[in-house]
């Protein structure tokens, strides 16, 4: 949680910590720099170093694909995923985008009983077969024409964007 500055990991290592957890929200380049720092550190110490991964509030489809790709690039195969607990799957996305995810990535997403796509977690795992077959994002470009423009100068509208009306 404390990996907020570019020098956080070197400071933690100097204090005796053994690693860091990557979060895409902290920056992908920072994650690569941390991985390089840990690789160098491991060459100069007897005790192992650790690079883990976590996602607190990652909402698919686009951000999830980026996060999964980054974790794979860093060699992190076990990721703490919490984002799917805080949001109603892809319910905030246009119906066309939801349908596209269920049609083209039915291994990664499943239909929630209320109809919207949600992560299809099976035995703690995500099936990435369709994602790996579409390495540059969703198999089908998402139709975003029905997204509502948000007035970022109005904090109330910005904060409530994507939240259910009820």
Predicted regions and their residues:
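Shared catalytic-loop signature of beta/alpha-barrel
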Residues: 3-127
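Extended hydrophobic packing segments that form well-structured cores
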Residues: 112-166
